[in-house]
Amino acid sequence: MTLADQFFELFKGLDRAHGAFKVTDTSKVKHGGRAQTMKEPYTVRLWEDHLEGKQGLGVVPINDNNGCFFGAIDIDEYNLDHAKLVKKLNEIDVKLFPCRSKSGGMHVYLFTREEVPAAAMRAKLQMIAVELGFGGSEIFPKQSQ
């Protein structure tokens, strides 16, 4: 199984649309570019392009059942101390996965083995964001139904 196949399996979300981001300016901390919603399923090929840095891919976490298998906290802080935040994440009793975002902040992912209601995912991530000191951060999924 390729890395793209693994990401395809891990990020299970809305299967009829996805986000795409084409970077056009890398001269600043936050890369400039064009984002758009594509009204078509995401594919392993799109994951390959994403992992190769050709085009950003955004999977909508909430599915048509108002459930999800993953969610994220979007911490948009330009002078973020990544090492300090990772240390905090390791102290929490929930397995979270941090990833640097294109803005220089961090996306903190929570994955589940089974589908959970989007409202429950949002509530859990909001609680974690507050515990981390980032209660005002954007939470995905954005909606609970």
Residue ranges of each PLM-predicted region?
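DNA replication initiation on ssDNA origins
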Residues: M1-F70, N79-K84
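Short secondary-structure junctions
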Residues: R16-A20, V94-P98, G135-E138
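Broad hydrophobic/π-residue packing in well-ordered secondary structure
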Residues: A17, M106-T112
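DNA replication initiation modules
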Residues: Q55-V86, E91-D93, T112-Q145
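Short, conserved phosphate-binding/catalytic loop or strand-edge motifs used
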Residues: P98-H107
